[in-house]
Amino acid sequence: MKIVVLGGSGFLGHNICKLAIAKGYEVVSVSRRGAGGLHNKEPWMDDVEWETLDAQKDPNSLLPVLRDASAVVNSVGILMENNYKKILQNPRGPVSHLINSLSSNMFKTGQNPLAPKPEEAKQSKNKVTFEAINRDLAIETAKIAAKANVPVYCYVSAHAAAPGLDPRYIKTKREAEREISKISNLRSIFLRPGFMYNFNDRPFTGALASLFTVSSSINRATSGALNFLGTASAEPLPSEEVALAALEAISDPSVKGPVEISELKSMAHKFKQKSL
């Protein structure tokens, strides 16, 4: 089985590649940085075909890579637009940014923290915007996959937004889902995890995971009283668990459409059991 992972050198993507190699799959990673996006060299990386190309600039450049592929997994996405890379490079940046956003919105009354802003940013091709990355790139690569006769396209979407984050984040994810689902001859899958964490790859995500674990527990105990918090009220998942779920989803012909958190957990467990 050959799979093509868009964003294979990223936070989630490299977990998908690693687990797919362990399963014996032929794996191709596509990103603008190739294997250069990974800081630590590991043995499994030698078995991945690292393709360096810009699918946003030229989606058709994917066609040779997609030849004979059984599935495409798109793990590309952005959580923020402004200074996104700088925030991630600062170990305290993402935590302080999101916690400050949460604290500034959690206790406001009479407002919906996820309500759309009066103005929506204009679509900007080949730039780092929600419209360009979360929506347009996903749609275009799905169309190219169908053109290349790839039968399965798995898009890593999201459970919800979170207070303080631009509502365009989740809006563009849902728009991508709707358009991709219209593409004929393509089994489209939309994974909807909440917050993803990994103590080894990004230690700072552990702090947020602990916070969201508490808030999600309270939300369940209060029958959804904290639903307005979006992702902050949903159970966080390890990035490896989402990667396992992605591999199970593409290998199971019955899986299509949105896959929510509880289903992700079940699929991850199922794939892990089959791999033992």
From Swiss-Prot:
Gene3D superfamilies the record matches: NAD(P)-binding Rossmann-like Domain (3.40.50.720)
Disruption phenotype: Strongly decreases cellular coenzyme Q levels. Increases cellular sulfide levels. Decreases coq4 protein level. Sensitive to hydrogen peroxide, copper(II) sulfate, and mildly sensitive to thermal stress. Decreases growth on minimal medium.
GO molecular function term, any single one: protein-containing complex binding
InterPro entries for the chain: ComplexI_NDUFA9_subunit (IPR051207), Epimerase_deHydtase (IPR001509), NAD(P)-bd_dom_sf (IPR036291)
Annotated keywords: Mitochondrion, Ubiquinone biosynthesis
Main localization of the protein described in the UniProt heading: mitochondrion
One Gene Ontology term, aspect cellular component: mitochondrial matrix
Protein's cellular compartments: Mitochondrion
GO biological process, one term: ubiquinone biosynthetic process
Family named by the database record: Belongs to the NAD(P)-dependent epimerase/dehydratase family.
The protein's role, per its UniProt record: Acts in the coenzyme Q biosynthetic pathway.
Name the UniProt record assigns to this protein: Ubiquinone biosynthesis protein coq11, mitochondrial
Annotated organism of origin: Schizosaccharomyces pombe (strain 972 / ATCC 24843) (Fission yeast)
